[in-house]
A protein has these predicted regions:
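Condensing-enzyme catalytic core mediating Claisen C-C bond formation in acyl metabolism
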Residues: 2-72, 170-249, 254, 291-307, ...
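Long, repeat-rich segments with strong aromatic
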Residues: 243, 249-281
């Protein structure tokens, strides 16, 4: 046996065949025992409430400050509400949750740290820009599948006011926006991932149907950073589309699949410009995904009436759309299998001011009706 064979046998002996059996290709995992997505909750702002998904959100507020004094505190309040709602739907006490995976767009992840501190759940703070919901869900599902705990919580958020202050201009400045710019979504999405379905203890719980009973995360494809050298932070769709292409293509290659194996391939916030680039890049690799594609940033707002230019963006865009609109369709069997691919533009105010390019990242989550 050659050195590679000896090495593989040593790894299998150390980690066990169970570990190796879940790996697929270069970047993917298919879970031997797929975790359940038990519940999800969405909290959104006033503009989102006026959009096409307004009636789908669990909680909306006409006051985008959510009773707070600052945009940052408002975003934290959204995260807290989303987590409490998600846990409440599944009747799970925060003390039963092993780990929380969360993040946002702000420096040092302050929206998350201030938002979830009262829950007192051990936390991994994440940053994947607008792909954070995918990163959090992937890690939560991997942790449950590995046996590290029965319950994991994933949460993320964004806020138009806090993002404008952080990355662009204070709202009072009233700067003009190019048509390629996105509108940061004011929303939060939280998801409870578990190893088993909880028992329904009463007719009231059964009637509410608040807990999902037919959704599993069957696998993930973890993305790589892809940088095409673009520097225009007001055209994030173009910056993120190459990363989305790379991850979707890798999912197809790792698993021997095509777009026909999914009811929907759903990106996070490529918007109208990014979607067009994604179609071209995927076609150059031999795949036509046009009839299967949906983008959360194009879904959450009405482009004609809400003047959001290229579409919605932000961590809360993909997260709240998944929680409010996509998962119910999987639960009722309308969609049997989707590939959820949140996308992120990895930039900061420092990198932008120094003239650095804007790399992209995308993670793919395979979610199925069961």
């Amino acid at each position: 046996m050659n050195d590679t064979g000896n090495k593989n046998r040593a790894v299998e002996s150390e980690r066990g065949p169970f570990y190796l059996s879940q790996l697929r290709g270069a970047q993917s995992i298919v879970f031997t025992k797929a975790p359940y997505l038990l519940s999800a909750a969405s909290v959104a702002g006033s503009k989102e409430a006026q959009g096409p998904l307004g009636k789908c959100f669990d909680l909306t507020n006409e006051d985008d400050l959510f009773g707070a004094e600052t945009w940052e505190e408002a975003e934290s309040n959204m995260q807290k509400e989303a987590c409490v709602l998600a846990l409440g739907k599944s009747h799970v006490d925060p003390k039963s949750v092993r780990y929380l995976f969360g993040g946002d767009l702000l420096r040092q992840g302050i929206a998350t740290s201030m938002g979830v501190e009262d829950l007192q759940i051990p936390i991994f703070g994440l940053y994947g820009a607008c792909s954070t919901s995918g990163e959090a869900l992937a890690l939560a599902a991997m942790s449950v599948a590995a046996g590290y705990g029965d319950y994991m919580l994933a949460v993320t958020s964004s806020h138009f006011g806090s993002a404008e202050k952080e990355f662009r201009f204070p709202l009072g400045y009233a700067n003009q926006r190019p048509l390629s710019a996105h509108w940061t979504v004011t929303a939060s999405g939280a998801f409870l991932v578990g190893s088993h379905l909880n028992k329904i203890h009463s007719d009231k719980q059964r009637q509410r149907k608040s807990q999902f009973r037919h959704i599993r995360i069957t696998g993930v494809t973890i993305g790589k950073i892809v940088d095409f050298g673009l520097k225009d932070s007001q055209n994030m769709g173009a910056c993120m589309a190459p990363a989305a292409t790379d991850t979707i293509y890798r999912n197809f290659q790792d698993l021997g699949r095509t777009q026909e194996d999914y009811d929907q391939i759903i990106t996070g916030d490529l918007g109208y410009i990014g979607q067009s680039i994604l179609f071209d890049l995927m076609k150059s690799r031999g795949y036509d995904i046009r009839k299967k594609h949906m983008d959360c940033g194009m879904t959450i707002f009405d482009q004609e009436t809400q003047d959001t230019h290229a579409g919605g963006s932000g961590c809360g865009c993909a997260a709240s759309t998944l929680a409010s609109y996509i998962l119910p369709k999987i639960e009722n069997g309308e969609w049997k299998k989707i590939l959820f691919v949140p996308t992120g533009a990895l930039m900061s105010t420092v990198s932008f001011n120094e003239g650095a390019s804007v790399p992209g990242i995308a993670h793919a989550i395979m979610i199925e009706h069961c």
